[in-house]
Amino acid sequence: MKNIRNFSIIAHIDHGKSTLADRMIQECGVITARDFQDQLLDNMDIERERGITIKSQTVCLPYTAKDGKEYILNLVDTPGHVDFSYEVSRALTSCEGALLIVDAAQGVEAQTLANLYLAMENDLEIIPVINKIDLPSAEPEKVALQIEEDLGLDADLIQLCSAKTGVGVHEILDSIVEHLPAPEGDAKAPLQALIFDANYDPFRGTIISVRLINGTVKAGDIIRFMSTGIEYKVEEVGLFKVQREARKTLSAGEVGYILAGIKTVQDTRPGETITLKANPCEAALAGFQEVQQVVFSSIYPIDTDDYEDLVVALEKLKLNDAALTFEKDSSVALGFGFRCGFLGLLHLEVVQERLEREFNISLILTVPSVKYIFTLSDGTTKEVDNPAHFPDPTHIDEVKEPFIKASILIPEKYMGAVMNLCMERRGENTTFHYPTPGRIEFICELPLAEVIYDFYDRLKSVTQGYGSFDYELIDYRKSDLVKLDILVNSEPVDALSQLVHRVNARKRGLHSCEMLKEEIPRQMFKIAIQAAIGGNVVARTNISAMRKDVTAKCYGGDISRKRKLLEKQKAGKKRMKTVGNVDIPQTAFLAVLKSEQ
């Protein structure tokens, strides 16, 4: 156990975590040059295409240090995006140390701080690494000063490297062996293993990733899940060496996987403790905080025959994505579907894309919303995240909406533009300070509903890509909320209803009407598209009718003949309008999701 090191790589988005992990794997000779590919640990196509890490991945690296001893380094590559910070917190519980990567050109950014605080909460030893020193714009001395002064980390531990070229990677591996502590635990004690992740394999069932705190486990053992008491027979144990590699036993201090023919998704909840039936441990390990969903949207299959497939797909996705929640939902316009909870808009996009790609289901999503708290006139409170469940306005005493504390790191020259953006989004209690010369940390309290829409894109736009953003939920505050209904041909479309602040209702209504006008095909009769709050129409647009030239066969002659034909056409269109249904194409629902620029 003295020769084991368990560590994570944490950083802001695009600071080079996955690239450094690739170089470490190459340096340790785990994979041949022929089998190597970039972003080796990012298994999903969507991760490779977007250049982001969504799912934490584990790999076991054998390494011979400069003292000549063989060490086992268990590396966990983590995501950098704020939506997936729960993946980071789960990965950190299985480690004793972390590499904190900072870009030599960008310096310390918002997510760098957030992930550092997560590591400190877990009492991890931290080795700062300044990456991308090969860039022409790199300023390693300046960034080293930032790390020492802003983060309070030891400057003597700072490692310089270029993950792209491989410079400095060997020194980082030596530093891990030298400065990170070995795991503590007793291999002879009763088994205590913490599940920190799980993946679904269609042939082998659930693959659980575990960190053994005490004891040993081998194939043939009967394991017990401590919270549920369910028991399974272990089929295989092993380590992650890019691919799974079976072993006879796993011992205290090691990070590996267990296969036990587990078919049900719910049993393998991350944070669960596993022990042996024959020699159980006395107490379960401290688990994880339940992750809080902040964005809610309804998902429906475009083809209603795909509903059963969607049920299966969500169940399987839930195993790989502990933060996803869903419950059954139905809509007059779209049929049966699910109301899902997500960690943010990127998480929502990723789930949608994975369902469409991996399970080949075409989907439609409703407008995202957050969870509001209503106090009703009879004194009861009601949590609402779906516009369909909006209480009767005459019974509402008070509405509260979630607020976040946003930390925005920007170059000084963009201060005015960012302040305007925050004020547009109903920002409050703005403060700022200078972490380093020329850079400002702008702290602002914002309604979450204003952030989930397109705040991150707008921030990147006004700061020309230099702004970074992190947030945490703080509390619920009183708000003036209304339900915005969209009516097509005087019929409300429930799937397009939105909960919005009264100040933004007209703007959002106009945007939705204009988007629908572009997407709904013209009919033989005029279609009115309206946005209404209760009985008051706040925005309206019309789709003009297609017109057949009924007077084409009239050559001159009496005007009354033309008028008679036009009146006859008008009466026919009026009759058509009263009985005609307007089919709203799927693209129209997606268009309403697009935020106003």
From Swiss-Prot:
Q: Where in the cell is it found?
A: Cell inner membrane
Q: Which InterPro entries does the entry mention?
A: EF-4, EFG_III/V, EFG_V-like, EFTu-like_2, G_TR_CS, LepA_C_sf, LepA_CTD, LepA_IV
**Where the protein is mainly located, per its record?**
membrane
| Biological process, per Gene Ontology | positive regulation of translation
Transmembrane helix among keywords: no
Please list the GO terms describing molecular function.
GTP binding; GTPase activity; ribosome binding; translation elongation factor activity
Amino acids binding GTP:
14-19, 131-134
Q: What PROSITE patterns does this protein map onto?
A: G_TR_1, G_TR_2
Give the EC class as a word: hydrolase
Q: How does it sit in the membrane?
A: Peripheral membrane protein
- Coiled-coil ranges from the UniProt annotation: none
Report domain tr-type G positions: 2-184
Alphabetical keyword list: Cell inner membrane, Cell membrane, GTP-binding, Hydrolase, Membrane, Nucleotide-binding, Protein biosynthesis
Query: What EC numbers are recorded for this enzyme?
Result: 3.6.5.n1
GO CC terms in record: plasma membrane
Reaction(s) this enzyme catalyzes, per UniProt: GTP + H2O = GDP + phosphate + H(+)
Describe the task this protein carries out.
Required for accurate and efficient protein synthesis under certain stress conditions. May act as a fidelity factor of the translation reaction, by catalyzing a one-codon backward translocation of tRNAs on improperly translocated ribosomes. Back-translocation proceeds from a post-translocation (POST) complex to a pre-translocation (PRE) complex, thus giving elongation factor G a second chance to translocate the tRNAs correctly. Binds to ribosomes in a GTP-dependent manner.
Family stated for the protein in its record: Belongs to the TRAFAC class translation factor GTPase superfamily. Classic translation factor GTPase family. LepA subfamily.
Which PANTHER family does this entry report, sorted A to Z? TRANSLATION FACTOR GUF1 HOMOLOG, CHLOROPLASTIC, TRANSLATION FACTOR GUF1-RELATED
What's the protein name?
A: Elongation factor 4
Which source organism?
Answer: Desulfotalea psychrophila (strain LSv54 / DSM 12343)
